Amino acid sequence: MSDRIYHSYVNNFYQKAKSPKNTQLIKQIQRSNPTSPKKNLQIYKNINPFNHENCQRIIEENAIRFSDKKTVQLGTVYGCNILLTTKNSQPKVFEKLIQLSDNSNFRQVTLLKSISPVSVVKAKDFLNDSISNRSRSAQKMYSDKDKFQVGNNKSSLRSLIYFPLANIKDQISEESKSKRNKIKVIKDMPIQLDNSFQTINHQINSPNNNIVGDQSHVILHNIFKKRQQAEEGLQIQEEPQNYIKNKLELQERKMYLENQNPKSLSPIKIHFNEKSMPFKNKIQKKITYNEQSSIQQTITLIKKKILGPPSLYSRLKKNSEQFKNIENLIKNKAKESHEQNMQEYLKRIGCTDKNKKVFCINSQDQFVQEVLIELGWIENKLFKSDLFHLKWIYTDINKDYENLKEGQFYNHFQNNQELTNKGRLLRNIKLYLVSYPHLQKYFPIQFDVIYKQQKEEFLNEFQKFEIFRKFKDVIQIIKNDLTQELINQLTQIYHTKFIKKEEEEELQYGLITYFRQNQQFKQYIEYINQVNKDIINLLSKIPNPNINEMLIKYLNDLSILQVDKLECDQEQGDKNIQAQIINLSISIELDNILEQIYPYTNFCNFWIIKPCGSSKGQGLQIMSDDNQIVNYTTQLQARLVQKYIERIYICKSQEYPQLYNKKFDLRLWVLVKSFNPLTVYYYKHAYLRVCSSEYDLSDTRNIFSHFTNYSINRNKFIQNKNVEDSAISLKLLKHIIKKEHGISYQKKIQPQINEIIIHSLKSVQKKIKQNNSCFEIYGFDIIFDEQFNPYLLEVNLSPACSKRNEFISKLQKEMFISTLNILFNTEYYQIQNWKKIKIQDQIQKVINESTHTQLQEEVILNSNNFQSEDSEERFISAAITIQKWYRQIKLMKNENQKI
């Protein structure tokens, strides 16, 4: 397709984009049945090139039409806008999308033919997640000039993937239409000296970047389309002051070039406008980088341009100390320029006090604005301005991090979604636990079922808990009928059998007499035998059953018991009862082991389903049927499946009506001042989030008794006129634990919570970009089991909740004042409630406890497959071998008897 035809097509596309005919066009698409890509192009060319906002608007306007799940699905995938229509709904929507994203060849879009539309409510979630999951392989698709229509014409699916376009009249220059095909970068878009194809691609694929924007067409048309002409070089025309504007960026460019492979960089040619050159004529007018030139030579040329003529640069290079001093002067000059700009701003608004602080805010946290104004700060209402000392934004964008200077503070870190997004946090935690598996005790079992492997792992885990549930039911009945003395004797038999035969027979004598008198136990024993066989068979079929080492001894003993049982089958009487007693003793021991391994569950097999990108309790469900869970997570955007903490701590004392028989969790504020080195504080005065109804595990549909989110319980609290009970001070829980159970919260529980905080942050430390001007406050949600063991539920972004009662309002203001005292080294109101966590002590403790080597970690990470330990596989193969051996012995005995 020639440039002329392409631009005429784009002009026609854009002129009709804003016409209010979207609904009619969609109807036309539904009625049509195109037979060729060319005809498809004629139908689709008038559709608005949806950006993020337009997509949501059209979904809302056509909510009634889309709710029947048979018509249209809208979304944005891999930098393209996509509209899918199909006659027949088919399952596994998101699984197909993931297969597509993992595939290096983007042209295999025919996989989309099996995708079915989803409801309106979940179309928004699909849109949000798809923007943040774009693949680099999209550039291969863009390099193909002629493929605007991708799909299978023979199927009922009619899909279109097209370029996101912008207003060409304002952006496309005359030079871009010429035959030379040079790239003219618009002046409004800053291009840095180290800009390459990868850098521009990263800008386009940024999660916070609107694909349909002022620069998107120029970038896609002039860079992606001409990627095949890379050998001719990308020619960038730009005025020098745009990239020499901030000399502090020299170090960043140097680090970028040093870390890149020369062959992976596109050729870059930088042309200077000779008339606007601030340097002398002796300096070269052109910097050229190609694959033959080394990285160091390029860095040298860059430094020559910034530091001056070659003679001056060579003298500075010889004296390294003087060179470092100049770099320090550059930093100091940048700091001075920021302070000068702030003083000029204060003078411009009529403020005579040069020490006044300025803040920008665009957030729902009203307490921030109230506290700063009370402290005498001045608000810059242009929250996108660079003139501030503190910027407080609800959600960040990548552009906010570009021009941060020393002395400024911004309340987010770049890539914080790695910690606050439920799906990304799960992946990071799992990778981290590969090196430190003993930390699994702080994180409930959880799976992202959108991935095929994790979906299979979830089903295996569900089956394992289901068979354990059946076992617990029957063993509980037996325990209720047995006295504690008999249970102790059975436990003693388990620990002494196969060691001292005389003592074992002596212990069994009383039990044999008891079993003879109670014939009902024969039914219990038969049921236990069947359950034990089911356990062995189930675990032998599961590839990675994730068996704890404590279970290995039990299951091997159970297999060995089958030899005695086979021998006793030939002889009735006491020997048979003796084998049954041993079997029962092993089963009781298994019950004790399960209590230790899974202290947070009573094996009801409840699982909680969570959407990845939602907040405020949206989309939460509790289910106990594996088929129902799989169907729910496949059709909707609820991807995460987490084991429900069933045996939580519930206050049973009526002295404390705020917590009596109600579920609660802990919301703990955590301040991260730096990720490298890791500097972390936790807020001492945390609070409890309490449910509005009493806890009842038999009724999982009552959301008011199982979810502590205030957005869920708000109306219930208002109706009951007890909003004050929605959030309670942690001091009350400390008092209850100390008085009722004799446990010190500060000595037993707080150290474990510190471990959860540190290792959660360590799991994402390499993925979050460090910036000395950034800080962030996270909300860690933690729940306790009956033994007061803490578990991390999730980590929240911007966790300072809205006003609900006086206690929370006071807590928010004190927390924020304490934050200001740490950031600006002040002493406002003498308040400091942040307590620093000793990082090195926690890390060293984990290293000492870890048994994994660095080599094992690398092997597992490279395979990207979380396998179980080798001991489990050896156990399963051994158990199967023992069972085969039993059968052979039995056959041999039967044959000998016949002879």
Curated annotation (Swiss-Prot):
It comes from the Eukaryota. ATP binds at Q642, K643, Y644, I645, K663, D665. Disulfide bonds: none annotated. One of its GO terms (cellular component) is cilium. Disruption phenotype: Cells lacking TTLL3A, TTLL3B, TTLL3C, TTLL3D, TTLL3E and TTLL3F display shortened axonemes that are resistant to paclitaxel, indicating that tubulin glycylation changes the lattice properties of axonemal microtubules. Axonemes are however normal at the ultrastructural level. InterPro entries: TTL/TTLL_fam (IPR004344), TTLL_monoglycylase (IPR051437). Its main location: cytoplasm. Keywords: ATP-binding, Cell projection, Cilium, Cytoplasm, Cytoskeleton, Ligase, Nucleotide-binding. Pfam families: TTL. This is Tubulin glycylase 3F. One of its GO terms (biological process) is protein polyglycylation. The gene is TTLL3F. It is found in: Cytoplasm, Cytoskeleton, Cilium basal body. Residues 471-835 form the TTL domain. Its EC number is 6.3.2.-. Probable glycylase which modifies tubulin, generating side chains of glycine on the gamma-carboxyl groups of specific glutamate residues within the C-terminal tail of tubulin. One of its GO terms (molecular function) is ATP binding.
